Amino acid sequence: MKQAPQNATGTPAAAPLAHPYVGMWVTQDGHIRHELLPNGRYDEARGHRKSAYQGYYTITGHHIDYVDDTGFTAEGDFRRGVLYHAGMVLYREEPAP
C-alpha cells in the first residue's frame, strides 16, 4: 500500500505552492470535483456529497498519485490540460475573476 510522502519530521510533505496543476478539476457534467490543494492534499466531491474522499496526492511530471485517508490508492495523468483519472476525464475549472 502506498503512503503519503513524508518530510524529515514524519509529517506529510507539501506540494509546491505554485504547481500548475493545483486547483479545481471537474468532470464535464460537474458530478465529480477534485480540488488539488497547494499543501499536497485533495478533496473530492461527488454530486451533492462534499468531501466524499480526502487524502494526499503527489505529482511527478504529468502523473498524479492519490492516497486517500483510508489508504486507498489511485492514479491519473495530465495530458494537454486534461486530467485522466480512473476512467474519468476532468477539466480545469478556472476561478471566478
Language-model regions, residue ranges each:
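Lipid interaction determinants
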Residues: M1-P97
